[in-house]
Regions:
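Membrane-proximal basic amphipathic "stem/tether" segments
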Residues: 1-36
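Acidic, carboxylate-rich catalytic segments that either coordinate divalent cations
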Residues: 201-208
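Residue-level signal for well-ordered alpha-helical positions
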Residues: 53, 83-86, 206
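Alpha-helical structural context
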Residues: 57, 157-158, 206
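General alpha-helical segment detector with a strong preference for membrane-spanning helices
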Residues: 48-50, 79, 203
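PAPS-dependent sulfotransferase catalytic domain
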Residues: 23-30, 61-73, 77-198
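Extended, composition-driven regions rather than compact fold-specific motifs
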Residues: 3, 9-10, 41, 80, ...
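A cross-family signal for N-terminal binding/gating loops and helix N-caps
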Residues: 2, 30-59, 65-66, 72, ...
Length: 208
């Protein structure tokens, strides 16, 4: 997948194919804002869970005394599959298919102009290492999506409140989606592996 990126304040701005069309990805969990909670947001990496916990801290007057700079990574192949499932789902009114998304990912059969929903979806396929390399802060703590219970306990201790457990999203893929995705993956495995290579290395260096 081809894209250009540039920094825009504390965010990244992405341009896909048609350079007149842009999409912006926010870095920090800023709605609601919790002072000293500095989270580098990577799409499809438990961002909704962190936003929900931040909301609890904000409404219950949680306070973090010392800046806590962290991010969450996801196993790259699992993240890619999750992004496809997200793309074919309710968020985009079930208008996109695995074949559609796969073609855009590969740079094939591109529309003359992407819709706002298409551009928004493509942000979820930008590799994780791009968000890390261009982060506006120095990340001190790395977690993966299997560490959410541990992270909840850490944030509870830091903020001085007992953050309620929110069951993170679990991947439940339909049989039809799995068949279609596995077929696409098998046909394009070499390209996918090459595209994810830096993310695979990053994930292994930190967690394995």
């Amino acid at each position: 997948m081809q894209y250009l990126l540039s920094k825009l304040g504390d965010s990244l701005q992405f341009k896909f194919y048609n350079k007149d069309q842009t999409a912006t990805a926010k870095y920090h969990c800023s709605k609601p804002r919790v002072d000293n909670l500095l989270f580098v947001n990577i799409p499809k990496c438990a961002t909704q869970t962190i936003a929900a916990w931040a909301a609890q801290m904000a409404t219950r007057d949680g306070k973090i005394e010392v800046p806590y700079r962290f991010t969450i990574l996801r196993e790259p192949y699992g993240r890619l599959k999750s992004a496809f499932a997200y793309g074919v789902g309710a968020k985009y009114q079930y208008k996109f298919t695995v074949e559609d998304i796969g073609n855009w990912f590969l740079g094939k059969q591109l529309p003359d102009k992407f819709s706002p929903n298409q551009v928004d979806l493509l942000v979820h396929f930008v590799p994780q290492h791009e968000f890390i390399a261009n982060a506006p802060i120095e990340i001190e703590h790395y977690f993966n999506t299997g560490d959410m219970r541990q992270l909840r306990h850490i944030l509870s201790a830091l903020s001085g409140i007992d953050i309620n457990w929110m069951q993170e999203n679990t991947s439940r893929y339909s049989t039809q989606f799995t068949i279609e995705y596995n077929k696409w993956f098998s046909l394009n495995e070499n390209y996918i592996h090459s595209y994810l290579q830096k993310d695979i290395r990053l994930y292994k260096d930190i967690f394995l």
